[in-house]
């Protein structure tokens, strides 16, 4: 009788654990920590309160021979389709600031972050941006927000 070999599913580098606090499901413990720090400092900010469309969707009419987006499947004609928009939802949105908690950036985040900055510049929207990567930087973010209001 042959022994069955189970292949372990390969995990990506980002393994944030989902956490629930105050009835809100946070994508990571760092987001929950930021929420608690903002709440303690009485700074109003909405968690995932707004989604921005940084690149509009469009119809791509040209022929395009390629595999599916994940690199699998058959190499075939995949043009002539609607291309979906690129959207970005920051973790916290306040009156004049935006916070994105990123312990470890995934593959698409750096380009999405740059596109978001361009979107803000092109639309003349003024928001201070903060991107804390650990609890110490979350605390520093709160201090910076409070000092900017004096």
Task: Annotate each PLM feature.
Residues 1-150:
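Electrostatic, structured charged patches in enzyme active sites and in nucleic-acid/phosphate-binding
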């Amino acid at each position: 009788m042959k022994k069955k070999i189970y292949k372990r599913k390969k995990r990506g580098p980002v393994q944030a654990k989902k956490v629930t606090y105050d009835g809100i499901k946070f994508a990571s413990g760092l987001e929950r920590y930021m929420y608690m720090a903002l709440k303690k400092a009485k700074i109003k900010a909405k968690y995932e309160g707004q989604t921005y469309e940084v690149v509009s969707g469009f119809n791509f009419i040209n022929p395009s021979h390629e595999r599916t987006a994940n690199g699998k499947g058959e190499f075939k004609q995949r043009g002539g389709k609607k291309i979906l928009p690129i959207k970005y939802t920051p973790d916290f949105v306040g009156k004049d600031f935006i916070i994105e908690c990123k312990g470890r950036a995934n593959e698409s985040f750096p380009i999405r972050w740059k596109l978001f900055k361009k979107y803000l510049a092109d639309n003349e929207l003024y928001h201070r941006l903060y991107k804390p990567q650990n609890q110490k930087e979350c605390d520093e973010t709160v201090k910076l927000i409070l000092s900017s209001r004096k």
